[in-house]
From Swiss-Prot:
Keywords: Cell membrane, Cytoplasm, Disease variant, Disulfide bond, Glycoprotein, Membrane, Phosphoprotein, Receptor, Signal, Transmembrane, Transmembrane helix, Ubl conjugation. Cell surface receptor for the cytokine IL10 that participates in IL10-mediated anti-inflammatory functions, limiting excessive tissue disruption caused by inflammation. Upon binding to IL10, induces a conformational change in IL10RB, allowing IL10RB to bind IL10 as well. In turn, the heterotetrameric assembly complex, composed of two subunits of IL10RA and IL10RB, activates the kinases JAK1 and TYK2 that are constitutively associated with IL10RA and IL10RB respectively. Residues 313-436 are annotated as: Disordered. Residues 22-235 are extracellular. GO terms for molecular function: interleukin-10 binding; interleukin-10 receptor activity; signaling receptor activity. Primarily expressed in hematopoetic cells including B-cells, T-cells, NK cells, monocytes and macrophages. Not expressed in non-hematopoetic cells such as fibroblasts or endothelial cells. Interacts with IL10. Interacts with IL10RB. Interacts (via its cytoplasmic domain) with JAK1 (via N-terminus). Interacts with BTRC; this interaction leads to IL10RA ubiquitination and subsequent degradation. Interacts with STAT3. This is Interleukin-10 receptor subunit alpha.
Amino acid sequence: MLPCLVVLLAALLSLRLGSDAHGTELPSPPSVWFEAEFFHHILHWTPIPNQSESTCYEVALLRYGIESWNSISNCSQTLSYDLTAVTLDLYHSNGYRARVRAVDGSRHSNWTVTNTRFSVDEVTLTVGSVNLEIHNGFILGKIQLPRPKMAPANDTYESIFSHFREYEIAIRKVPGNFTFTHKKVKHENFSLLTSGEVGEFCVQVKPSVASRSNKGMWSKEECISLTRQYFTVTNVIIFFAFVLLLSGALAYCLALQLYVRRRKKLPSVLLFKKPSPFIFISQRPSPETQDTIHPLDEEAFLKVSPELKNLDLHGSTDSGFGSTKPSLQTEEPQFLLPDPHPQADRTLGNREPPVLGDSCSSGSSNSTDSGICLQEPSLSPSTGPTWEQQVGSNSRGQDDSGIDLVQNSEGRAGDTQGGSALGHHSPPEPEVPGEEDPAAVAFQGYLRQTRCAEEKATKTGCLEEESPLTDGLGPKFGRCLVDEAGLHPPALAKGYLKQDPLEMTLASSGAPTGQWNQPTEEWSLLALSSCSDLGISDWSFAHDLAPLGCVAAPGGLLGSFNSDLVTLPLISSLQSSE
């Protein structure tokens, strides 16, 4: 029985040994190694030769310090395996070892173990990315360190490799020469000088740690294009400075142009106020005082005595106060009127010869008197007022109207007539040339009232009136008018009387002296006005004429003077209508 048990054990042993011999028939993997980056640990092995489609590989991991192997995965047909999850503590441990075998059904191969220990020094150093930019002709780069997702929060590249980090930078120009420029920096920020070259530049970075033997891997190539920078900071500053200067110059020119063309203030003498349409409509023009021109009644004027018509009154503009101012009309031609009735003048001369009277002023050559002098009554008896012409030493320079009102104190008839407009004296009975045209003459002017102290005792009041002849050659005539009432005219106050022709007629030139008290309607040459019309109290002309009854006697000579002394002009002229 003992021999049966020995045979059974030998058979079992032979079966077991046969099974072991059959499992060793597959070849083992040629090599096993780790390829690790920062927190990316991969185990690689080499496949067995002549493997079938059913061949797979088993992996076991051994950590230093622990004696047993730890099977990591089931059989897989891949040639690599990611051990990152089971080796997270790699950077804080002594390292790991791994082994791999091939399995094909019931057969398997021997284990192939890594040749080296997998530690931190086996980790290949890399960078996450490289960022490039251009600034003032420099390429500025920034290295981004790797940030793996599976890494613990406290395990970063900076914390693990805290010292002696270095980066090697390679620059390549595309296109053109492909020479690389290598540069090492110790910081993640770097700058590269391009030397003014333009084109595309590509940069690569490889990290390293000076205190370790870790390998570094070149990063992915980053490229940037360089062109000529026209809008640099310097160029922009220069451009804006130029624009600012140009704007300032334009503003100055514009301001100067506006200053030159601005509306300037005119002098006050050149300012004209625009009339407002409302003011122009509302305001009415004020009436202006104008010279009154009266028409001449030629038929009535022919009835006036030739002595009164031919008197020289045109050149007189005297004020009557003895001023030496020359007349403004002395150079004007004299208007002389012929005497249409020479016989009447002789008859008048026989009855009452006119008296040649002296001027009221001492020197008639320089006199600018109006020529009308109203003498005070003399103590000697008088036959009546006479018309008397002023005769001076030099009648050519006289600016007198030629009318003088004096009183003949001696009562004698003058045997001499006034001189002509040319200044010569004529006999009492002149022969007026027949060829003279009997033109009708109208004049208006002022008559002066004065007292002649030199002739108070020698003359009675004579009113002498001169009328310029048309040709300037006729003699001057004087006529004395005797007041039929026999009253001596009182002394007259100094002043002016306006002579204004009205529609009144005078008696014919041949009438006797007593017939001068004609109705006022017959006077056309001399206008009669009442004494009450004289409105100026200083002259007191109406008061002095009250005894004469100038209002009661319309034919009186003194009533023929108009009293409009304010509004009418001083200088009068003779108007002749032919």
